[in-house]
Amino acid sequence: MKIAVCGKGGCGKSTVTSLLAKALARRGKEILVIDSDESNYGLHRQLGMKLPRDFTDYFGGKQNVLNDMMLSKFTHQFFEETWTIDDIPEDYYSLKDGVKLMSSGKIHQANEGCSCAMGTVMTQFIQNLRLTEDQFALMDMEAGIEHFGRGIDNGVDLILIIIDPSYESLQLSKKIGELSESIRKPFYYVLNKVTKENQEMMYEAVWNSSRVAVSLSANSGIMREGLMGKELLEKPDAIENLT
């Protein structure tokens, strides 16, 4: 199953992605985590891994990818055949405890241009990726909804929307739900950073409460590990239930 993890910046996409990946791996599943956010420099730390090499380098680097796109009027196909998790070159992933991490690419310096190259490569990659019943691909998406405009979400099986206790997050989650329905993808909500004080308000304010999968309580251990850039070792019951 291919799952896109979406939401506003700071809502907890990387945290949920990391915790879910670890929980599924403990159940004996083979997990591929795809870092699809060129601005995210923390996901690999939460998984206890090194940041892997940019996957765009496999195709000659960001500039070569852009050149191929422009010369073909943006129709260039980077994948001639379907791929499996085992087909990912060893130089382009990190591996720990049954979880494999790859990265679409990062912005490394000022004025290097947009992230269109990474988006195009990942759109085609996820569409050409074939998984078995015991394999999961979790895509930690960039904040917001631009990835819907790029068509990346067309290649997934399920969309997981993370919501934190803020008006902006609730409003964006409604839009993501609508976009998910427009491309006929099932979606579920994860209420994150939930407390006794905000739980009822969040549940009542969410666009479609029947799509709430779990509520993840605010956790001081997770917050501390995240703040220090350490591997997330907590095992919240809500994440176990989500698996």
Locations of regions flagged by a protein language model:
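Walker A/P-loop phosphate-binding motif and the immediately C-terminal alpha-helix
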Residues: 2-36
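Gly/Ala-rich phosphate-binding loop of Rossmann-like dinucleotide-binding domains
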Residues: 21, 25, 153, 181
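N-terminal phosphate/diphosphate-binding loop that engages ATP/GTP or pyrophosphate donors
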Residues: 23-97
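Conserved nucleotide-binding/hydrolysis micro-motifs of P-loop NTPases
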Residues: 38-39, 107-109, 143-144, 166-167, ...
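Phosphate-binding/switch loop-helix module in NTP-utilizing enzymes
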Residues: 76-145
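Conserved beta-strand segments of the P-loop GTPase G domain that flank and frequently precede/overlap
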Residues: 103, 160-164, 189-192
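Inter-motif core of Ras-like GTPase G domains
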Residues: 124, 128-133, 147-167
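C-terminal lobe/tail of nucleotide-utilizing enzymes
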Residues: 181-243
